[in-house]
């Protein structure tokens, strides 16, 4: 009898301990959002609801608990995973978590980590993740069993229900926000978006139809270029912060001045602006496809729909007027059949570069090697005007492996020179940090800008039009929280009249953009390019507004 009483007392005292641990567990994601200790210790409604389910099941006297406990544990893991994503996505990508679209990134994330991490590290991390989620589920199940034993005591059940009632009353009459400490409304919101999938698809297809209609009005596209070569450099992580944050700007300003002064002396005219990218901190393909099509592609679902549409990408306009269209994408290390949509005549992916140098983790090869390879294989001896798009990668997160720039381009060869110890500057990542910080970020940007400057100065002859644009801001650990998505865009040419249409549109003279927030969308660039050099004027601004309006309803 005494043993029975002792067990009952232990079960009774276990209830408050389990409730406190559950509440702390479900409030852990709040630390990411800020608010400190106060938010952590505020009671969790999610934990209370799960405990209430155990209480009511026990009170009803229903037999068994194994299946119910497992279901509640699975539900708890699901809620915690949702809370973690809801806290971390805004931190890294400066946008809300969207279950409908973000869950589709998981296969790409898996492939990216598999390709960029060493084998043992990747599989060890995968095992730890599975073990962690499994351990979390087992821990929750054990906690719920403790609650069930404790709730068999009527006094404990009543005490728990009274506690819930007190918390609800305090929520209604004071500033204690018990009912706000839950993921339920956000989960319901995301479930509602999934239910509206058909509406989203219809709105996106309407946006694509507008682009197709506009494209059909361009009978002689880009004839104003008069056969001049066009080079498009899309620079990884080249964002607004480089110009707007005083610390970043002070570090990069010498390179910016050198870039402008060098090219101006050699007869180039430069105009610059900021445009609002659909991506932040990653997801470069969204900004690349937005730039290529003139339709804002701001999530994976829209990206997939785009590839099934009749939208005409930028390369096709050049194809139609006799250009050879080339894209260089060294970071594309696996089969990418969707690339056919973009209509490039010649595509260079990782396997096509004959690179014999080291893999620099996130950057499989250096951008100077890529530019040199394309110049030797495409630019030299070209018999057609060229449209070449470079998707640059050396400035990728975590900004800690900065290639050496070789003044003598003939040294680059097959890339094996990068095996030399002095060919890559490896910056330290301090314990607890994810990147090489502002120093690494600015060093990566300086490398890319110097590479473009030196290539234009030494190898681009004649009347070419050069476009340099960022794909997205670096992640929020570099920019800070709640920063704009804007990226710089520069148009450069020795033909002043190629730059004039952009200045007339509000671009700033020179390399440093001056436009105030808010900025026009990245999707406006292709229409403006077509308007500037084609004989038919497009309704670019209304279309852009319509696309944004459609997006706002999602």
Write out the residue ranges for each language-model feature:
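Short N-terminal signal/transit or membrane-insertion segments
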Residues: 8-19, 156-178, 198-207, 220-224, ...
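Short secondary-structure boundary segments
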Residues: 11-41, 117, 183, 187-217, ...
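A diffuse structural propensity rather than consistent per-protein peaks
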Residues: 96-102, 193, 284, 349, ...
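Solvent-exposed soluble domains appended to multi-pass membrane proteins
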Residues: 213-228, 232-235, 240-554
